[in-house]
């Protein structure tokens, strides 16, 4: 397995729409494994392939405290949403920013697992929030897109300054 480079906002590659995975083969399984390792090392609880410069519909999530419950979602699609819930979110591609975002409280998602098997998951709370956040990445959307224009401008300036300092 390998640690992958995580793209940081305002990198325009984060705005690309991910393409569906045609077949769950060795390369997709390796990508998922590398993404999990990268996410754990970061550390984070979710990562979309777009964030590691691979525009494919692959997401990894693990909200467990001990990294024991990895979830791989390939070609995920939310098929039902219910209620509203607000929770604080952060993002590995937008470091040091944590803000409340309102999303569906409960969701049902269809996806292929790491073995290419069709799955359905009904979930709520943190896992529902995390899935919605990561699926936004597959559409080229970031959690900061839910913020006001002024707040997004401040975050962009901060991100650009951080890039200059790290270059």
From Swiss-Prot:
Binding site for Fe cation: 91, 133, 137
Binding note for cofactor: Binds 1 Fe(2+) ion.
Keywords: Hydrolase, Iron, Metal-binding, Protein biosynthesis
Gene3D superfamilies recorded: Peptide deformylase (3.90.45.10)
SUPFAM superfamilies recorded: Peptide deformylase (SSF56420)
GO biological process, one term: translation
Cofactor: Fe(2+)
Enzyme class, UniProt record, top EC level: hydrolase
Superkingdom of the organism of origin: Bacteria
Catalytic reaction list: N-terminal N-formyl-L-methionyl-[peptide] + H2O = N-terminal L-methionyl-[peptide] + formate
Pfam families the record matches: Pep_deformylase
Tagged with keyword Lipoprotein: no
NCBIfam families: pept_deformyl, PRK00150.1-3
Functional summary from the UniProt entry: Removes the formyl group from the N-terminal Met of newly synthesized proteins. Requires at least a dipeptide for an efficient rate of reaction. N-terminal L-methionine is a prerequisite for activity but the enzyme has broad specificity at other positions.
Protein name: Peptide deformylase
The organism of origin for this protein: Nitrosococcus oceani (strain ATCC 19707 / BCRC 17464 / JCM 30415 / NCIMB 11848 / C-107)
